[in-house]
């Protein structure tokens, strides 16, 4: 099963079969086959907190050709700030994320897709999975902020 196997020994399984722990994510962004696949698409992806079931929906797009799509975004999660700048994820801390989060791909786009189109799909997935945190919710289950959901602007 992919979620329990070491990435270094597995071929890329196809975008629809990606489900990685944080440790596997780190291995994937180092693996040449995975790097090629992830670097050639833009995407809407899902982070799942396996402990609580909460979700975070994010998008990865190349702004002015400067980034390598999903590879750039997931490399940030692997090596940099595990929160991607999200306030609620930051509050959890890096160790919690490493121990409890898994990463999957909801939808892919070729590198010519416009950021606004990807963001529209990201918002659709946020609404579909109810991943936006509202303080008035009796049982919230999402890490996305209202500001993230309402923003129509690509991140600079």
Predicted regions, residues:
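Long, charge-rich alpha-helical interaction segments
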Residues: 132-139, 147-148
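A residue-identity detector for tryptophan
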Residues: 34, 54, 74, 124-125
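Active-site or metal-binding loop neighborhoods of secreted/extracellular toxin and effector enzymes
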Residues: 144-156
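Domain-level recognition of nuclease-like catalytic cores that cleave nucleotide substrates
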Residues: 112-133
């Amino acid at each position: 099963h992919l979620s329990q196997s070491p990435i270094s020994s597995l071929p890329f399984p196809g975008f629809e079969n990606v489900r990685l722990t944080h440790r596997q994510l780190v291995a994937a962004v180092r693996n040449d086959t995975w790097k090629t696949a992830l670097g050639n698409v833009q995407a809407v992806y899902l982070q799942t907190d396996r402990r609580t079931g909460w979700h975070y929906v994010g998008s990865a797009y190349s702004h002015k050709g400067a980034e390598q799509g999903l590879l750039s975004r997931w490399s940030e999660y692997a090596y940099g700030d595990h929160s991607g700048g999200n306030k609620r994820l930051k509050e959890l801390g890096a160790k919690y994320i490493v121990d409890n989060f898994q990463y999957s791909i909801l939808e892919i786009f070729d590198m010519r897709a416009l950021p606004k189109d990807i963001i529209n799909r990201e918002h659709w997935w946020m609404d579909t999975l109810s991943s936006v945190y509202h303080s008035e919710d009796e049982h919230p289950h999402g890490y996305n902020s209202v500001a993230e959901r309402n923003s129509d602007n690509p991140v600079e």
